[in-house]
């Protein structure tokens, strides 16, 4: 029997004015706040004000323009957005589309995901700090609002702490304001940039890629190739753009990106013109944390611009926080990470909250702010990890194109072209390792190590489960039938449920049958064996059943999308009613009940917990991985919470985890005289 379950199906994202506003608020927060620090980083890297000329500025904005065009527009908007999994995007969604091609593709998926999570920890810190630094030296009624970096740090910490605190309540209410605010922000970027650019239209020659390439070898560029480490900051939000596709739809991104891109480019060009016209003003050399974004604005509107920039930075941070929840949730469903407690604070699709992730992100942000102290120092660490994610995405995109039978020249050309560019960006960003990049590299390594232990440990366990530990349900049909009708044993429950994995339609781990028959015979009317299969599609909600020709044994195969909540208790109640309606199971009328005409009896769920047995035969590295995986289970959410059984009647039983074939040692029986003839131990 196959059927569908009630679920939140994927919505068709219509292209409307409201949807476009939502897109601005959800998708572009990261890339939209880049003008706050990109030109600042480029100028500081070359020695600051007075250490560059017009050609340097033209080459810099030319590099920014072509980076946005090649990486963001061509790779992500035109190519990657077409590689969607039922409308969902991101590196894990892309992996699910190609994982059948080769087993090793799990590695680039985990590396890319770990790097993306690590870099996301830095984004809230750098964007909010940069915005608040704009308040330094600003006068209100003759008083300086903020006059030192210590005050910047405290204000930043308060804002970020508040942002993480409100996550548990859901952000749908304030989220409705994100779109309009970001529309105002991008419009402000474009208008401010256009006004500055109008003072010197010759800056438009930067659209010629010659100036970009020339700057890389120009003596005016003191950073050489490493200037690309700062240029790359302009496109770090491209990966988030792809990951957030499922929230807004491809069409809304297609239509909104040109406007966003134009506003960004205008602002970068405007900053370049202002820098060119003010490069010789020595007074700017005395400004700590000099930022051309704020300095090019008239004093009269600077405070309003700082407030708007702070709101944009908060929205960008919120997008990264929500994206991290989604990324971790997908990793859990793909068995890359241990099961964690996930809360759905609102009824909105895709809005979730993971307490442990929220706490880790918050503490990481505070540690980063306390360690680096200034946005300039943070920029030195920013962007290194995301280059790795982009390289991994390119590799998976190549596999996707091959799986869709794209011409070999197109697939290979895409791989070579983008890999070459992103490798150059990676090399240029590698210098950041010594200037703080080691922080994100270390975080990414820790996340990757956890992913590797969990995923590879699970594979070792599955590959080494000895066949003798599996048993056919057919072989025990008669015993289960006799037990359910045996009056010598009290009824344990009406419906007894085991969460398991059934192989070849009828093989289950023998420990389950041992739990039913040997440990303490559990008499029930129906024995349920439930398997949850996570599908490559995000919102699948289907099931199949097999009763093996009985009315007391049911094999349930649940097929749930990798973004679906596993509410097994709720789903089983629908399934049993479906089966009773079809005549596959008899009704279970209850004599004592508060529910009139109740036809379904009580349920008990038995959850088995594994502990590594001393008899396990695997050795060395594999045994260490298994032991590490079992330790990770202590931080994981309980199976009852994971399967949606918090309020159900559950029984926990511990079983030994035996991997590999156990050698059988045969004892020789001695007669009494032979035993007495044995030499005695001198120590006794």
UniProtKB/Swiss-Prot annotation:
Q: What is its main location?
A: membrane
Q: Which family does it belong to?
A: Belongs to the HAK/KUP transporter (TC 2.A.72) family.
Q: Which residues form the signal peptide?
A: none
User: Would the keyword Cell membrane turn up in this protein's UniProt record?
Assistant: yes
Instruction: Identify the HAMAP family for this entry.
Output: Kup
Which function does this protein serve?
Transport of potassium into the cell. Likely operates as a K(+):H(+) symporter.
Record lineage: Bacteria, Bacillati, Bacillota, Bacilli, Lactobacillales
The record's keywords, sorted A to Z, are: Cell membrane, Ion transport, Membrane, Potassium, Potassium transport, Symport, Transmembrane, Transmembrane helix, Transport
| GO MF annotation terms | potassium ion transmembrane transporter activity; symporter activity
Transmembrane stretches in the record are 19-39, 61-81, 104-124, 151-171, 177-197, 223-243, 255-275, 303-323, 352-372, 381-401, 407-427, 433-453
Annotated localization: Cell membrane
**Which InterPro entries did the record assign?**
K+_transporter, K_trans_C, K_trans_N, Kup
Q: Which organism is it from?
A: Lacticaseibacillus paracasei (strain ATCC 334 / BCRC 17002 / CCUG 31169 / CIP 107868 / KCTC 3260 / NRRL B-441)
Q: Membrane topology type, per the record? A: Multi-pass membrane protein
GO cellular component terms, semicolon-separated: plasma membrane
Q: Reaction catalysed by this chain?
A: K(+)(in) + H(+)(in) = K(+)(out) + H(+)(out)
Instruction: Name it.
Output: Probable potassium transport system protein Kup
